């Protein structure tokens, strides 16, 4: 077996956890009905005997889980307490029409999503009625792909699609009147106007007090070459 899943019911079964961990394979550790301290003990038990990967799965041990009991923010809490491990979500809620529970779990940082699957939700038993069927999977896949597009990149920086607006919508320093050669640049004889292709207003301190070495016309973009 390439990956082992330890269910929530065995989270405190430390001898069993160590037995599985000794196989040195990746482990999915479900955490339903557990305290943070119990999870830490289970993780340490794995770490003591294994160098395999560990994924810690937020889970609510209730079948089905009511939406108000899903507590998806616990995914964030697990991230904070176990920054070295991937965090996932094992879902027992009934599928909603947009698969919003799983989508939200992904948006909160779950990188592994576990959900029961069935071909027929009407089959008797404790697993089928809250499982995904093929149509649910299609909906989930479609919405997950859409959300992935929306999430984009993490690092804040100008985007290619903003290049034109960055130039045209930003302000530049311009002459607020005709400025004769030899005139000192002051706050009174400049203004800030579009486009943003000249000197940024953020550099106002770099030009105040400078002397115009050419005639600068009203509304003309001021350039450093015009100043001394």
Report residues per predicted region.
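Catalytic cores and adjacent flexible loops of soluble metabolic enzymes
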Residues: 1-228
């Amino acid at each position: 077996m390439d990956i082992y899943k330890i269910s929530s019911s065995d989270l405190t079964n430390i001898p069993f956890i160590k037995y599985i961990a000794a196989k040195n394979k990746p482990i999915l550790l479900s955490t339903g009905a557990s305290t943070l301290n119990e999870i830490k003990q289970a993780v340490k038990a794995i770490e003591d005997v294994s160098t395999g990967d560990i994924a810690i799965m937020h889970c609510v041990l209730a079948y089905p889980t009511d939406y108000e009991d899903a507590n998806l923010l616990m995914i964030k809490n697990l991230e904070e307490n176990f920054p070295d491990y991937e965090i996932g979500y094992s879902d027992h809620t009934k599928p909603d029409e947009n698969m919003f529970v799983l989508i939200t779990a992904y948006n909160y940082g779950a990188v592994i999503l576990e959900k029961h699957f069935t071909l027929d939700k009407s089959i008797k038993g404790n697993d089928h009625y809250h499982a995904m069927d093929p149509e649910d999977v299609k909906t989930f896949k479609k919405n997950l792909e859409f959300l992935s597009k929306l999430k984009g990149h993490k690092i804040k920086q100008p985007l290619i699609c903003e290049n034109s607006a960055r130039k045209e919508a930003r302000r530049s320093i311009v002459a607020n009147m005709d400025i004769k050669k030899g005139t000192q640049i002051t706050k009174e004889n400049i203004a800030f106007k579009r486009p943003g292709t000249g000197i940024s207003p953020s550099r106002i301190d770099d030009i105040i007090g400078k002397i115009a070495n050419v005639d600068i016309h009203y509304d003309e973009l001021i350039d450093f070459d015009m100043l001394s």
